[in-house]
Amino acid sequence: MAAPSEAPVTRQVSGHAAPAPVPSGPASWQPLAAAVAELPVLDASGRPVLFGELFRERRAIVVFVRHFLCYICKEYVEDLAKIPKSFLQEANVTLIVIGQSSYHHIEPFCKLTGYSHEIYVDPEREIYKRLGMKRGEEIASSGQSPHVKSNILSGSIRSLWRAVTGPLFDFQGDPAQQGGTLILGPGNNIHFIHHDRNRLDHKPINSVLQLVGVQHVDFTSRPSVIHV
């Protein structure tokens, strides 16, 4: 079960970076890391900080989600919330989620998912663009995700319900935007990039943890897939 929810560390990305293609190899990723590191982020109260500060001192797993109303993203982040902080501390690794909604949605999303690791937002999708995150879904088989509990009908209904009953009626981000996963730091180094091709193409969490030497987590103690 996830640890009790704590006040999340939250900042919002702003700025006006132009889209850029992502280089193809680790050596050429360093200028890309340096470029995104200079983009400013804001926390939930609007305080600015450079994105690069998040991975300057240690390695960071950075998960870019589609949007906070996406039921698949919600269930994926629910499993991220189950990663014990002690596991990350032992490996000297930080876990960060980036969304693309207004920062006003961050605290409700954390309460909903039980997520208490670091979380920020990029409402204008500037970092998404710089990193080459896809917009629109590629038709490709991504297999069965170990982190998705709902089917498309039940999940979509719950997402719509959250949209119409929330204090701000919006989609909490561009619904066509896809996410991805990176491993960065310390400093301006990118060690791994995965671009999601569609909403189900996120990396299994334990495969990412393995890359940074973090212990595997048992995500199986949860309800079966919900059918409607």
UniProtKB/Swiss-Prot annotation:
The gene is PRXL2C. Belongs to the peroxiredoxin-like PRXL2 family. PRXL2C subfamily. Residues 1-22 are annotated as: Disordered. Transmembrane segments: none annotated. Signal peptide: none annotated. This is Peroxiredoxin-like 2C. InterPro entries: PXL2A/B/C, Thioredoxin-like_sf. Residues 13-22 have a biased composition (Low complexity). SUPFAM superfamilies: Thioredoxin-like (SSF52833). Disulfide bonds: none annotated. GO terms for biological process: positive regulation of ERK1 and ERK2 cascade; positive regulation of glycolytic process. May positively regulate ERK1/2 signaling and AKT1 activation leading to HIF1A up-regulation with an increased expression of glycolysis genes and enhanced glycolysis.
